[in-house]
Amino acid sequence: MNESFDKDFSNHTPMMQQYLKLKAQHPEILLFYRMGDFYELFYDDAKRASQLLDISLTKRGASAGEPIPMAGIPHHAVENYLAKLVNQGESVAICEQIGDPATSKGPVERKVVRIVTPGTISDEALLQERQDNLLAAIWQDGKGYGYATLDISSGRFRLSEPADRETMAAELQRTNPAELLYAEDFAEMALIEGRRGLRRRPLWEFEIDTARQQLNLQFGTRDLVGFGVENASRGLCAAGCLLQYVKDTQRTSLPHIRSITMERQQDSIIMDAATRRNLEITQNLAGGVENTLAAVLDCTVTPMGSRMLKRWLHMPVRNTDILRERQQTIGALQDTVSELQPVLRQVGDLERILARLALRTARPRDLARMRHAFQQLPELHAQLETVGSAPVQALRKKMGDFAELRDLLERAIIDAPPVLVRDGGVIAPGYHEELDEWRALADGATDYLDRLEIRERERTGLDTLKVGYNAVHGYYIQISRGQSHLAPINYVRRQTLKNAERYIIPELKEYEDKVLTSKGKALALEKQLYDELFDLLLPHLADLQQSANALAELDVLVNLAERAWTLNYTCPTFTDKPGIRITEGRHPVVEQVLNEPFIANPLNLSPQRRMLIITGPNMGGKSTYMRQTALIALLAYIGSYVPAQNVEIGPIDRIFTRVGAADDLASGRSTFMVEMTETANILHNATENSLVLMDEIGRGTSTYDGLSLAWACAENLANKIKALTLFATHYFELTQLPEKMEGVANVHLDALEHGDTIAFMHSVQDGAASKSYGLAVAALAGVPKEVIKRARQKLRELESISPNAAATQVDGTQMSLLAAPEETSPAVEALENLDPDSLTPRQALEWIYRLKSLV
């Protein structure tokens, strides 16, 4: 668009001058410019929109001597087009006509009333109902990062201060913001490159004093001590920029944003980006949502419940008091699931409706849904009243009753309101006397027109005469062409059609003016009454938000009760003793997709048994066994029941996974480099209370390098860090670790080989595996028989060269699989270069001492 911008607008028409001035205020984003029933785009905006939305690009005359590229969309379909643009990461400024065309001498007055961006949308047509839509801001200084997130559709405002790059990367993956604000001098661009909705902001928006002032103004406070964020300067810098951006885009007050909460690492189990990805919590490795933990666990009946459950899954809490309360609630609700869920389903997405109420963008159907949600509360209270559980009763109290608001909306809004207030017919009859009077006048038109038609037919004797109305010409009397010559003299021709003539008479014109006036006044009054409803509802916003949060939590807990009953989960026991003891544990996702019974397995990790070396064939179930342990721990720490017969679990501060890897081509990192980076992160950050899953360390390099790295990593985790570790490997040398270190044990997953076939038992047994079964798995995968045959020959050759290769000790001298020559010692090299015939007796004696020192 810049190519067409003329800073001197005088060459343009008045309408284009107005457009260009508005566009100059929003140069980086699309401007939807309201003209009658359409939003128009001009110049480069039109070209861009035609490509993004697949709409026609036309021209609108000329301005300053140049044809103007133009594209347009009908105003009634704007939400569909906005959704397409937002999904592509675009932002749009909505410019409306605010002046009256009838009284405007020049172009109608217009102004930008809101800016729609990916992170600040609240309209249900633009949002995914079962996912949070977050706006985030990131700040960095020499001490670490500041990070703030806001869900404008709920008012949930959070900040944190990640100490290092890995923690910041994990936060970005956990929150997955739709839009991310960053300072113009942000140094770690590699951390955020490739993320959607990046917005570069000026440095002054991140100033700490401005941030404190903005936040205190928003919350109506003198300081931020009460929120526990007073000293979080880096987080506040990010939060201040974020709040300013929201105010700039929304152009309205934000009463639903009432507090800010600090998220501290010590409050939750920390999972890095690789762990979240590998455990497939809400997204599978292919980027979809099928066969994830959330897909199995989420049978919530409200969108706000679904979003809360996903937040719980990504932020397991370490406070066992909270977890035991959740367990108690789940147990107490199991008998009432079938009664509660149908009622909860009717509550809908109250959380987001309240956000639109706060932004004053709620539509008539939003208020109807709010009324419907209020109508469910008495039934929910009645059902929960009999549940003898203190946490359940606390939830019931937070839900509230809102009988007065329910009564207000039942009186004010009709049962099935139209989409928009401007369509009319939103306010119920009987709510307002004056409105009823204007409506009666407007609605009486049909009876009057029927009477007028009968009277005029009788008076004129014209049987083709009829009275009608259209939006262009208003009311008219129509007579067929064949009888039009008989029209009375007081009939004034208004319109000529092919087969008829249309007339107006003074009486009809007078009535038309009266009816149209009444319709306009009724609509204006209806809009006024609708706005007054907001004023009556908004003082209760804080209580309503608390109720929505309680209803969402109830939905999550009822859902977990249903899942526990349906999927045969058990309630885990928390203990202060380190370790995890699982009896007949199952993988929550794999057991749902199998067509055969899942083989349950035990697990025992304790201070005396901190590391399990897991061996067995490929496809034998090692990765499944490891992941199910992490998922059982994760479920326990959101308060859920777990897929096992019995679980006792101690303190866990972090979960790490080094499971599988792929090339990171975008960053120029090989599979091995990715693997080593993840391994380094674990070795630097794991503690004795961490759960660590290590799968096939050292595969991407030579046998010696890989084995040495795997051995050293296992040694470090077992001896120095003392983390609870599951260490799967194909290096059979590692099965000797239990003989050399305390707290290490061998387990294996077995298989049976019969001829060319192999049967995986998927059962975990104590001790090391007897062999790898690699060739049998290759045959099962369809590798050609001649290749398998040749591989067997080569295997026999290698085994004959180095019969003890699999059993040699790693900390002693290990023979090469390909019998490479040993490294020559310095003493041997010196002897080979020595000429004994040239030595004197004294020199020979000196050489003996020298060789002695070299050995």
From Swiss-Prot:
<dbReference type="InterPro" id="IPR005748">
    <property type="entry name" value="DNA_mismatch_repair_MutS"/>
</dbReference>
<keyword id="KW-0067">ATP-binding</keyword>
<dbReference type="GO" id="GO:0005829">
    <property type="term" value="C:cytosol"/>
</dbReference>
<dbReference type="InterPro" id="IPR007860">
    <property type="entry name" value="DNA_mmatch_repair_MutS_con_dom"/>
</dbReference>
<comment type="similarity">
    <text>Belongs to the DNA mismatch repair MutS family.</text>
</comment>
<keyword id="KW-0234">DNA repair</keyword>
<comment type="function">
    <text>This protein is involved in the repair of mismatches in DNA. It is possible that it carries out the mismatch recognition step. This protein has a weak ATPase activity.</text>
</comment>
<dbReference type="Pfam" id="PF05190">
    <property type="entry name" value="MutS_IV"/>
</dbReference>
<dbReference type="InterPro" id="IPR007696">
    <property type="entry name" value="DNA_mismatch_repair_MutS_core"/>
</dbReference>
<dbReference type="InterPro" id="IPR016151">
    <property type="entry name" value="DNA_mismatch_repair_MutS_N"/>
</dbReference>
<dbReference type="GO" id="GO:0030983">
    <property type="term" value="F:mismatched DNA binding"/>
</dbReference>
<keyword id="KW-0238">DNA-binding</keyword>
<dbReference type="GO" id="GO:0003684">
    <property type="term" value="F:damaged DNA binding"/>
</dbReference>
<dbReference type="Pfam" id="PF01624">
    <property type="entry name" value="MutS_I"/>
</dbReference>
<dbReference type="InterPro" id="IPR036187">
    <property type="entry name" value="DNA_mismatch_repair_MutS_sf"/>
</dbReference>
<dbReference type="InterPro" id="IPR007861">
    <property type="entry name" value="DNA_mismatch_repair_MutS_clamp"/>
</dbReference>
<dbReference type="Pfam" id="PF05188">
    <property type="entry name" value="MutS_II"/>
</dbReference>
<feature type="binding site">
    <location>
        <begin position="616"/>
        <end position="623"/>
    </location>
    <ligand>
        <name>ATP</name>
    </ligand>
</feature>
<dbReference type="GO" id="GO:0005524">
    <property type="term" value="F:ATP binding"/>
</dbReference>
<dbReference type="GO" id="GO:0140664">
    <property type="term" value="F:ATP-dependent DNA damage sensor activity"/>
</dbReference>
<dbReference type="InterPro" id="IPR017261">
    <property type="entry name" value="DNA_mismatch_repair_MutS/MSH"/>
</dbReference>
<dbReference type="InterPro" id="IPR027417">
    <property type="entry name" value="P-loop_NTPase"/>
</dbReference>
<protein>
    <recommendedName>
        <fullName>DNA mismatch repair protein MutS</fullName>
    </recommendedName>
</protein>
<dbReference type="Pfam" id="PF05192">
    <property type="entry name" value="MutS_III"/>
</dbReference>
<dbReference type="InterPro" id="IPR000432">
    <property type="entry name" value="DNA_mismatch_repair_MutS_C"/>
</dbReference>
<dbReference type="GO" id="GO:0006298">
    <property type="term" value="P:mismatch repair"/>
</dbReference>
<dbReference type="InterPro" id="IPR007695">
    <property type="entry name" value="DNA_mismatch_repair_MutS-lik_N"/>
</dbReference>
<keyword id="KW-0547">Nucleotide-binding</keyword>
<keyword id="KW-0227">DNA damage</keyword>
<dbReference type="InterPro" id="IPR036678">
    <property type="entry name" value="MutS_con_dom_sf"/>
</dbReference>
<dbReference type="Pfam" id="PF00488">
    <property type="entry name" value="MutS_V"/>
</dbReference>
<dbReference type="InterPro" id="IPR045076">
    <property type="entry name" value="MutS"/>
</dbReference>
